[in-house]
């Protein structure tokens, strides 16, 4: 801790407000001297002292009146005990006539300067207590002080044993301490009365000070004897009363937690420091009475004239002082003292004077000497000269060592925050003992007999509030805040202080960031590395360490064993750094490390539950409600799905929900427990319920990511139930809370969708959904005190019906969107709005696909009736409506990709509609109907819209390829149906052929055979099939065409072209040997048809040669067939258990046999025709070696083929192998003939 940077009177943010409206003094107006840090050099020993006035209620300084010699101070001045404009409102206090310091004076200062407590300041105390501690080695007087630890700060207050036990005799409390004290000093306690000399000295000092401020004593009448007697008795009464101790047993009647209790006459205070991003918690009403004047003030008001931040060497102290300060000396400020001339100043008095001047930064002391009340003379003494006065010599260095040793002793042993420690030294004793009164009190019947409990708890709470309110507060201090709050809750009785406990538990829940991943473990300043020296309750139980043992080795009476630590001799305090070795930072209060989200949320919910219990216990109307039994399930309203009406019922519930949300906006909701809106119970319960809803939402989201959908639905149900209760209590719904609700409903929609898609694990999901912890039950019971929690039951049912689940999911998204619409959150949260619309589009796509599949299933079940049923048409309409709405959702957020996917699905729906109209007529008489054409055309339109939506393939290649494929399929299907079921009754053959050709070419255009994608083989097969069909169509046209030679030639060229392309594409595929073989056979048939129209043998031979060449190129197809047959034959041998049906799934044996028979016959025919033509041409023409080779080869192959076909016992594989062998011979023969022809 460094020295304060500012000089002079510094203002506390809460000083004036909390002090009855007294204004803070500026540096210019302050009656204090400038608080510049000063180094005093006394006797060669340097002592550093710096004083900064943080607050002062004193009026501007006035010069003291120097009394004439022989003035009789025994006579009262005219202004004695009367108010004066020169004195201001704190006149009697300034002149030292106020009653003694209250036992909670340090708490009053701590409340006013809460920023300094816990970290910046080492000690907070009355200056009288500081002086008493520093005089311990010099004084035989008894010392009795209460010590409290708040973080790094120690609060010191006088613990007046006499006053305490006098009260004990009247009320019966504190008896445990009285008995302990009597055992400790081994004698019966008796109250010691003040001597007459004591009262005489106080009276003469008071009169002297009044004389010193009175410039004209004769101007005012002397008080009458009756007034003097009254004043004197009043003063003695104050002295006899001493401190005003609060009643530790019950709460005073005025300290009511009833929000309707009168608050007239109370001073305004700063609100309690409850942090929360929704709203601030109410101020603690109990705090109000603790700070006000009157019989119930309990002494917690900061009534010091000055609050000074005093730095003595390295010790930082917040000190309260009432010392009178005057002007009129050689310096701007002096302190005024009255001394008996016959009694020399002793060391104790010198230390008193020196410390007072140091603390108040007063550079000079004015001493007035008297004899028997008669003024003799005045003497001016500088502050730095006080330690060197005759008979009052003391070492300032020793005072510094005493201060450092005492602070080290206390900090090392007062380790438990919130505990009351008692620093005690008996009169005439050299032993100083430290006791833990809180621990001793807990051993009694009523552990709340400690009157310090409430002030300490409030201070712990306020310090924690203040730390959380700081915007620049590092999260590493969260451990400190948590420790402060836990100790606060531990100190208080739940039944007596529900508001503080509820607030503290809410703040504890706020420490955990629910909506952020845990990042502290990897940061530079983790939470468990606090710089604060306080620590959590788990770390309190420490074994006897060396440092503690060094204080407890005394063999004093048995009660000494209960002392936390002992200083065996006060002389040790004067030894430099005697206790420095033990003045160390204690283990830091580690913030709990939550390893996962669920653990973190569960911790938050535990604090929320404790807070809710505190609130519920304080509501008066609780007796009117039946007691909640956590073990008894809460009956929930339930409607059977059959009576609820499915989606129609959901529509009604949605309408009711939206109406309810509208009423919330108007503030017409109220709870059932009787809480008064605006009361602390009402506000705190709202905060706690909102926190619980957030925690359950995060738990649900975490379960969702783990695919635990039943658990996720249970948590989101609890979140929505919490929010429903919040809605019932809230009179003015904040936009942020509405945003939370939209997020909850969005997540609920996600969960319902995932449950619909994972129906196979329904039993496990149901088990998770029905499980409930005791903590959840208790929170739910608290919610049921305010609401039925059924507002969102429609969204959280776990249905077994797929359609119902999808509908619920959709309604959740719609509700989330409606909230964003009517609360104008759409523009404020554009990202969430986009996500909601995406989900709406997605769920409508899912529902549209569901209805489309149902329609397709109905279509497949049609056997008797071939007309389209009304049910199918209704499903088409539902599906189309969902797709249309989904497309609108995606288009509204410019999501072209998803809009294209839904347009694609709409195209698919049109194809389903087209397929439904294909079975209207008998299969043999069937024609491609106009309805089919209409729906296929609509499908094409939607696919084209999808492509236009995407723009280019680069935008989203996968979606683009998918839409392209579907469009190609639609064109192909439409062309195939027109080709296979030509509508000849409505259209001419030529028109049909033209339409088929155009559709096929469009299909081919959208069939990408070049891109190396997973769909490439399918595209190649589709393209090959298209070419094959076109070739077959032109071949058929050529056969049936008569007349137009130009058209015939065109058809012949196109047929040859498409056959060639089909063969090439099928050649690339490894799983289409039959298709390749069929194409080649059709090409051979096409060659035979051409040959039939030829007249010359040369032309026929050329055509035959081309046909045989096509036959040779079929070897590849036969090789593939042979390979599959071999694998099929080997399969049973390798694995007898594997059925043969599993092998060669792509090979159709019947089709292979059929094609093989055709192939054998056509090869036989071609070979025979070739042999005939070549033989006849050989007879007519001269011999040709090349032709001889070909002829000879053809004869051999023909002979072998005849023998093979004649053998009826050959297997399919053997026949295939023979064909392959013959084709190889035919190919080699052709190559030899070609080779011999080369010169």
Curated annotation (Swiss-Prot):
Compartments in which it is found: Nucleus
Compositionally biased intervals (Acidic residues): 530-547
Keywords, in A-Z order: Activator, Nucleus, Repeat, TPR repeat, Transcription, Transcription regulation
Compositional bias of kind Low complexity: 9-28, 253-263
Predominant place of localization: nucleus
Superkingdom of the organism of origin: Eukaryota
Cysteines paired by S-S bonds: none
TPR repeats by residue range: 693-726, 914-953
UniProt-annotated stretches for the region Disordered: 1-39, 219-269, 517-559, 620-646
Any Gene Ontology CC annotation: nucleus
Entry-linked PANTHER family: ERYTHROID DIFFERENTIATION-RELATED FACTOR 1
Function (record text): Transcription factor involved in erythroid differentiation. Involved in transcriptional activation of the globin gene.
Protein's name in the database: Erythroid differentiation-related factor 1
Species name: Mus musculus (Mouse)
Lineage of source species: Eukaryota, Metazoa, Chordata, Craniata, Vertebrata
């Amino acid at each position: 801790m460094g020295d304060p940077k500012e000089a002079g009177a510094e203002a506390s943010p809460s000083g004036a407000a909390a002090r009855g409206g007294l204004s803070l003094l500026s540096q210019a107006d302050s009656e204090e001297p400038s608080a510049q840090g000063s180094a005093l050099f006394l006797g060669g020993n340097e002592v550093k002292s710096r004083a900064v006035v943080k607050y002062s209620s004193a009026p501007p300084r006035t010069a003291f009146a120097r009394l004439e010699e022989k003035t009789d101070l025994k006579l009262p001045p005219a202004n004695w005990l009367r108010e004066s404009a020169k004195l201001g409102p704190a006149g009697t206090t300034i002149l030292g006539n106020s009653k003694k310091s209250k036992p909670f004076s340090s708490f009053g200062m701590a409340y006013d300067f809460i920023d300094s407590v816990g970290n910046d300041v080492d000690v907070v105390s009355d200056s009288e207590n500081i002086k008493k501690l520093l005089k311990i080695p010099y004084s035989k007087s008894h010392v009795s002080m209460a010590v409290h630890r708040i973080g790094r700060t120690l609060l010191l207050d006088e613990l007046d044993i006499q006053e305490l036990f006098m009260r004990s005799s009247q009320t019966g409390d504190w008896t445990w301490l009285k008995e302990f004290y009597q055992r400790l000093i081994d004698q019966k306690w008796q109250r010691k009365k003040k001597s007459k000399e004591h009262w005489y000295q106080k009276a003469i000092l008071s009169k002297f000070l009044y004389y010193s401020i009175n410039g004209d004593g004769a101007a005012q009448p002397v008080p009458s004897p009756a007034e003097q007697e009254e004043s004197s008795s009043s003063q003695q009464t104050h002295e006899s009363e001493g401190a005003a101790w609060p009643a530790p047993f019950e709460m005073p009647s005025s300290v009511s937690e009833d929000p309707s209790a009168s608050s007239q006459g109370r001073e305004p205070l700063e609100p309690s420091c409850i942090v929360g991003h929704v709203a601030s918690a109410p101020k603690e009403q109990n705090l109000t009475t603790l700070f006000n004047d009157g019989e119930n003030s309990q002494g917690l008001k900061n009534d010091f004239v000055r609050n000074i931040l005093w730095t003595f060497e390295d010790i930082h102290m917040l000190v309260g002082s009432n010392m009178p300060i005057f002007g009129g000396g050689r310096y701007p400020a002096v302190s005024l003292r009255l001394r008996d001339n016959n009694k020399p100043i002793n060391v104790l008095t010198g230390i008193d004077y020196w410390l007072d001047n140091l603390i108040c930064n007063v550079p000079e002391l004015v001493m007035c000497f008297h004899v028997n009340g008669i003024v003799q003379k005045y003497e001016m003494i500088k502050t730095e000269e006080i330690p060197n006065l005759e008979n009052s010599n003391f070492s300032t260095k020793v005072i510094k060592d005493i201060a450092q040793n005492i602070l080290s002793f206390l900090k090392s042993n007062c380790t438990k925050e919130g505990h009351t420690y008692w620093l005690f030294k008996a009169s005439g004793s050299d032993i100083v003992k430290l006791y833990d009164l809180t621990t001793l009190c807990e051993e009694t019947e009523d552990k709340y007999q400690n009157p310090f409990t409430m002030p300490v708890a409030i201070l712990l709470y306020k310090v924690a509030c203040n730390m959380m309110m700081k915007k620049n507060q590092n999260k590493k201090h969260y451990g400190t805040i948590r420790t402060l709050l836990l100790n606060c809750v531990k100190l208080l009785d739940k039944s007596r202080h529900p508001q503080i406990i509820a607030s503290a538990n809410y703040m504890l829940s706020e420490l955990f960031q629910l909506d952020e991943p845990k990042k502290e473990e990897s940061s530079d300043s983790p939470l468990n590395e606090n710089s604060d020296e306080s620590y959590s309750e788990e770390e309190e139980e420490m074994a006897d360490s060396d440092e503690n043992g060094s204080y407890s080795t005394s063999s004093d009476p048995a009660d000494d064993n209960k002392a936390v630590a002992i200083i065996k001799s006060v002389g040790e305090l004067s030894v430099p750094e005697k206790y420095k070795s033990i003045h160390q930072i204690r283990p830091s209060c580690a913030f709990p490390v939550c390893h996962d989200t669920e653990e973190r949320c569960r911790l938050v919910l535990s604090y929320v539950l404790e807070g809710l219990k505190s609130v519920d216990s304080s509501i008066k109307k609780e007796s009117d409600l039946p007691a909640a039994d956590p073990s008894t399930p809460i009956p929930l309203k339930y409607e059977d799905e059959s009576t609820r009406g499915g989606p129609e019922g959901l529509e009604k519930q949605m309408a009711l929900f939206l109406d309810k949300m509208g009423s919330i906006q108007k503030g017409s909701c109220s709870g059932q427990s009787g809480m008064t809106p605006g009361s602390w119970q009402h506000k705190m319960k709202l905060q706690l319920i909102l926190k619980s809803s957030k925690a359950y939402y995060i738990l649900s989201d975490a379960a969702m990511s783990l695919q635990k959908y039943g658990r996720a639905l249970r948590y989101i149900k609890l979140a929505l139930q919490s929010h429903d209760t919040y809605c019932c209590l809230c009179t003015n719904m904040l936009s942020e809370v509405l945003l939370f609700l939209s997020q909850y409903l969005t997540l609920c929609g996600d969960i319902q969708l995932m449950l619909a898609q994972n129906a196979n694990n329904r039993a496990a999901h149901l088990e998770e959904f029905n499980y409930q912890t005791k903590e959840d039950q208790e929170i739910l019971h608290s919610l049921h005190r305010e609401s039925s929690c059924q507002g969102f039951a429609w969204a959280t049912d776990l249905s077994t019906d797929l359609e119902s689940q999808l509908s619920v999911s959709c309604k959740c998204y719609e509700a989330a969107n409606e909230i964003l619409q009517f609360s104008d959150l759409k523009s404020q949260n554009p990202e969430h709005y986009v996500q909601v619309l995406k989900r709406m589009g997605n769920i409508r796509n899912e529902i549209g696909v569901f209805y489309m599949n149902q329609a397709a299933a109905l279509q497949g079940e049609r056997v008797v009736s071939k007309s389209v049923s009304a049910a199918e048409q209704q499903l088409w309409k539902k599906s189309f409506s969902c797709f249309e709405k989904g497309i609108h959702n995606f288009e509204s957020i410019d999501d072209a990709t998803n809009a294209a996917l839904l347009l694609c699905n709409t195209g698919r729906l049109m194809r389903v509609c087209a397929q439904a109209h294909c079975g209207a007529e008998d299969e043999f008489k069937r024609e491609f109907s106009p309805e089919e054409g209409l729906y296929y055309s609509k499908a094409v339109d939607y696919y084209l819209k999808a492509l236009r939506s995407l723009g280019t393939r680069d935008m989203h290649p996968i979606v683009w390829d998918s839409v392209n494929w579907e469009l190609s399929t639609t064109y192909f299907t439409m062309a195939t149906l027109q080709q296979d079921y030509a509508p000849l009754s409505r259209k001419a053959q030529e028109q049909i052929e033209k339409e088929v050709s155009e559709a096929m070419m469009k299909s081919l255009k959208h069939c990408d055979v070049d891109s190396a994608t997973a769909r490439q083989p399918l595209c190649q097969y589709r393209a090959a099939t298209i070419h094959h069909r076109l070739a077959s169509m032109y071949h058929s046209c050529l056969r049936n065409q008569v007349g137009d030679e130009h058209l015939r030639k065109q058809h012949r060229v196109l047929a040859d072209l498409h056959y060639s392309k089909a063969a090439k594409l099928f050649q690339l595929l490894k799983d289409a040997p039959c298709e390749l073989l069929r194409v080649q056979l059709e090409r051979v048939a096409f060659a035979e048809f051409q040959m039939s129209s030829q007249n010359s043998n040369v032309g026929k031979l050329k055509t035959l040669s081309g046909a045989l060449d096509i036959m040779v190129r079929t070897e590849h197809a036969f090789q593939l067939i042979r390979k599959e047959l071999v694998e099929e034959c080997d399969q049973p041998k390798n694995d007898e258990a594997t059925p043969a049906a599993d092998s060669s799934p792509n090979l159709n044996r019947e089709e292979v046999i059929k094609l093989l028979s055709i192939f054998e016959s056509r090869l036989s025919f071609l070979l025979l025709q070739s042999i005939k033509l070549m033989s006849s041409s050989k007879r007519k023409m001269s011999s040709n070696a090349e032709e001889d080779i070909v002829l000879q080869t053809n004869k051999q192959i023909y002979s072998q083929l005849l023998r093979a076909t004649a053998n009826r016992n050959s297997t399919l594989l053997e026949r295939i192998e023979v064909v392959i062998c013959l084709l190889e011979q035919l190919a080699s023969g052709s190559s030899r003939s070609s080779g011999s022809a080369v010169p």
